Amino acid sequence: YGMTKTKGYIADTQRNYQGNYYYIFPEISASGDLGDGLENNMVLLVNSAGFTVKEDLGDTLTVDEVMTTSPDGYAVTENEQTQGEYTLAAVAEEGEAKLTVIASESMINSQITDYFSNLDNKRLFVNMVLNNFDDVENLSIDPKSLSVEMNTVQHAGSISTALIFGVPAVVLIGGFVIWM
């Protein structure tokens, strides 16, 4: 179906959770039925495999990449790190046949979906499954979570640096100006 699995784990140095390159926030390009109900277009994948899509697919085969890494993605093995943009989920269609591929089982891992309840992992997974059936609709109602929601900040390192060094510098400079 025009997809080749890459060797090793996929890491992303640009779109990751708190500096851990194997905790990836992929770029999501879900349109139509795949994008229904997505609130913030954020999905977290942990220790994901990946694959590449062939450029010459022929006339009847189409592959829609649903989740990809940034161009700063890496396929990491014991011996090498290969930089590139890798596909983490895709839908291939040829005639009446559809194949949906998700490269990471962590997409619906309860440890991730319970801890980060503001992510769209479950919704996108259900949309991808329902996309394979033309006459089925999602009638599920999301339960109200009573747990504390954790805030997921993508670029915490730069914000922390600005607050740790920037705010005291402004206070010190302001104090010296008033003192003089």
Predicted segments, located by residue:
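Alpha-helical transmembrane segments
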Residues: P168-M180
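Short, aromatic-rich amphipathic segments at membrane interfaces
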Residues: M107, D114, D134-L163
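Acidic, S/T/G-rich, low-cysteine, solvent-exposed domains in lumenal/extracellular/periplasmic regions
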Residues: Y1-E137
